[in-house]
Amino acid sequence: FALSTYENHFGPYMWNRVGYCMVPFNSGAMEHATNIAYPKATATGTLTYQTLYAHELSHHWFGDLATCRTAEDMWLNEGWAHFCEFLFTEALYGTNSYLAAVRLNHESNLQFNTPKEGALTLSNIPQSVTYGDHVYNKGADIAHTMRGYMGDSLFFYSVKTYLANNNYKDVSSTDFM
């Protein structure tokens, strides 16, 4: 379901397969083109980790197809992958669920992330927060905001164009804009 959602919004999946494996580590996951590694603990037979699965799959567009040039622009990978979790939620559970999740992300970003990590820009961030909440939550917040201002038709057309113009390239935040 996530694969067809992402193909509809971002363009075709560019690899010949999607593989999954469970590995003996305790946190996080890691996508590689054609294969995604998840911690064994996420194989529960429930929907508990569905957004983690959707997040890692989305990296085939935001991270593998087009990737950030430097760690200081990690939001182009992780912020967009976090945005894709919300897009997956919307496709599966509807617009109201999407909007509630976006609202919670925005409030969390303002209430917790900014005081914890500081008021950082999305590009040229310190490497100490490359994988911080700021990159994920604020990055997704920016994508949601652009979607809201642009409307779905123009927003998703623009994202498809960005990805098509940057197939197998590294990009900076400046390139993105």
Cite the ranges covered by each PLM segment.
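Juxtacatalytic substrate-recognition/specificity segment
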Residues: 1-73, 84, 125-130
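An active-site-proximal "capping" alpha-helix that borders the catalytic cofactor pocket
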Residues: 2, 6-7, 77-89, 176-177
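Sec-exported extracytoplasmic/periplasmic mature domains
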Residues: 7-11, 62-63, 85-93, 147-148, ...
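Short, well-structured active-site flanking segments
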Residues: 14-16, 70, 74-78, 92-102, ...
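Active/binding-pocket-proximal capping segment
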Residues: 24, 75-82, 162-164
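Secretory-pathway/luminal and periplasmic proteins that interact with or process carbohydrate-rich
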Residues: 27-32, 67, 88-95, 166-172
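Acidic/His/Gly-enriched intrinsically disordered linker/tail segments
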Residues: 78-141, 145, 149-150
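Amphipathic alpha-helical substructures
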Residues: 132-177
